[in-house]
């Protein structure tokens, strides 16, 4: 659970630390806005991962691709954003497709690194569905690289996490990567 008062005080200190007048019209409500934003994020992080076991005969790959997301780099607290692709091969259970989208959003709404985000999504799908295999690919632009440091916008960082037959069967892996590129 988040501590709204700590967020408000922290943002006030941050703004003062960078030389802002926290009583200025455009900024005076910013600490409360930031705290409210994190409260909204916290609410979105929990959801029911609904399963449908009545479709137990379906055994081909299921993919939800181009799932948009926004996250926050834990190193610089700057956004990174992009799209995620999730696939799994059922083993007697399928989920509502929106649950895959919600999984991406829930895991992205916290300070994070893309590599861990990719792994966490794969871990949740694996845990909840116990499928034959899981594949997750994330493509993202990191503002910590675009706005600061190298200051080179437009780059795409790609991470992947594979489980089960996505890892052990080259044909499954190739099919997954081919389908997300279409």
Swiss-Prot record:
Disulphide-bridged cysteine pairs: none
Keyword Nucleotide-binding: yes
One Pfam family named in its UniProt record: GTP_cyclohydroI
InterPro entries linked: GTP-CH-I_C/QueF (IPR043133), GTP-CH-I_N (IPR043134), GTP_CycHdrlase_I (IPR001474), GTP_CycHdrlase_I_CS (IPR018234), GTP_CycHdrlase_I_dom (IPR020602)
Annotated GO CC locations: cytoplasm
Catalytic reaction(s) noted: GTP + H2O = 7,8-dihydroneopterin 3'-triphosphate + formate + H(+)
Keyword Transmembrane helix: no
GO biological process, one term: tetrahydrobiopterin biosynthetic process
Broad EC category: hydrolase
GO MF entries: GTP binding; GTP cyclohydrolase I activity; zinc ion binding
Pathway(s) this gene product operates in, as recorded in its UniProt entry: Cofactor biosynthesis; 7,8-dihydroneopterin triphosphate biosynthesis; 7,8-dihydroneopterin triphosphate from GTP: step 1/1
NCBIfam families in the cross-refs: folE, PRK09347.1-2, PRK09347.1-3
Subunit comment: Homomer.
Protein family per UniProt: Belongs to the GTP cyclohydrolase I family.
Protein name: GTP cyclohydrolase 1
Protein source organism: Hydrogenobaculum sp. (strain Y04AAS1)
